[in-house]
């Protein structure tokens, strides 16, 4: 057991009663093939991988399937409703995924605009209400809006997934204060979704005290996805440890790091 493992041995990401050691979640899109997806997942140390039902053949056993490469006993396969633009589409997609896989978890995405891929909060909320009633563990992709985040918790969502920046933008964290407000507003896990561009974007997010971070494009479009996966693994750990350790206060003026008492020639 490494030093960081000892420090985090009792620290878990817990969603709907299920515990995960890793706070990094991987998206499965954009990789060149399923083999690379598997290698990146293993290198990242992640225990959850999201799967776009419309884009990966998890519902068609006659075609090559991501589940042929990833053991669902070892990882949580998290179907998502990427590509849906209405609550009705998202509900049907989630139902189809559950029927095909037996998985009742869903990362709920209802997109409001094709150019920005920002979420349609009204449609997402409508879909979430139905899916929660149907027995799903719902993790909605949302704006970094603390008011809406609380509404999603109130209807029974198991976590909320606010964006750091638009999907695939790689811009990194744009509004830390809203994420802090969301963390204060809800008691369910807050998992930052979208906008991560590199491993260096992760520690500032994790230091806010959020519970986890999801990334895909930053891995798939890296020059070396495996190395980036390893970097993100340790960036997530570093950010979490920094949050738990507690940073020093920021000050306007300098404070000497060495004692001045007894310094020669100092009056």
Swiss-Prot record:
Compartments (UniProt record): Cytoplasm
Catalysis: reaction(s): [ThiS sulfur-carrier protein]-C-terminal-Gly-aminoethanethioate + 2-iminoacetate + 1-deoxy-D-xylulose 5-phosphate = [ThiS sulfur-carrier protein]-C-terminal Gly-Gly + 2-[(2R,5Z)-2-carboxy-4-methylthiazol-5(2H)-ylidene]ethyl phosphate + 2 H2O + H(+)
E.C. number: 2.8.1.10
Pfam families for this protein: ThiG
Pathways involved: Cofactor biosynthesis; thiamine diphosphate biosynthesis
GO biological process: thiamine biosynthetic process; thiamine diphosphate biosynthetic process
GO molecular function: thiazole synthase activity
One GO term describing the cellular component: 2-iminoacetate synthase complex
Positions contributing to 1-deoxy-D-xylulose 5-phosphate binding: 168, 194-195, 216-217
Keywords: Cytoplasm, Schiff base, Thiamine biosynthesis, Transferase
Active site: 107 (schiff-base intermediate with dxp)
Subunit structure, as described in the record: Homotetramer. Forms heterodimers with either ThiH or ThiS.
Function: Catalyzes the rearrangement of 1-deoxy-D-xylulose 5-phosphate (DXP) to produce the thiazole phosphate moiety of thiamine. Sulfur is provided by the thiocarboxylate moiety of the carrier protein ThiS. In vitro, sulfur can be provided by H(2)S.
Family according to the record: Belongs to the ThiG family.
Name of protein: Thiazole synthase
Organism: Aquifex aeolicus (strain VF5)
């Amino acid at each position: 057991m490494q030093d960081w493992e000892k420090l985090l041995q009792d620290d878990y990401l817990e969603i709907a009663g299920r515990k995960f050691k890793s706070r990094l979640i991987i998206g499965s899109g954009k990789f060149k093939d399923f083999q690379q997806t598997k290698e990146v997942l293993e290198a990242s140390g992640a225990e959850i991988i999201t799967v776009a039902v419309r884009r990966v053949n998890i519902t068609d056993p006659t075609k090559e399937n991501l589940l042929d490469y990833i053991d669902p006993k070892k990882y949580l396969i998290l179907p998502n409703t990427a590509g849906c633009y209405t609550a009705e589409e998202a509900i049907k997609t989630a139902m189809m995924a559950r029927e095909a896989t037996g998985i009742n978890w869903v990362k709920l995405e209802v997109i409001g605009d094709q150019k920005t891929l920002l979420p349609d909060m009204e449609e997402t909320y409508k879909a979430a209400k139905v899916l929660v009633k149907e027995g799903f563990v719902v993790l909605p992709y949302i704006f970094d809006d603390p008011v809406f985040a609380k509404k999603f918790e109130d209807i029974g969502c198991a976590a909320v997934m606010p964006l750091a920046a638009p999907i695939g933008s790689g811009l990194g964290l744009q509004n830390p204060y809203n994420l802090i407000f969301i963390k204060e507003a809800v008691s369910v896990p807050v998992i930052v979704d979208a906008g991560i561009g590199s491993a260096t974007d992760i520690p500032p997010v994790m230091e806010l005290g959020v519970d986890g971070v999801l990334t895909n494009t930053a891995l798939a479009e890296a020059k070396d996805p495996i190395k980036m996966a390893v970097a993100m693994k340790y960036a997530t750990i570093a950010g979490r440890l920094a949050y738990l350790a507690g940073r020093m206060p920021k000050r306007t003026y300098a404070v000497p790091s060495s004692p001045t008492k007894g310094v020669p020639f100092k009056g």
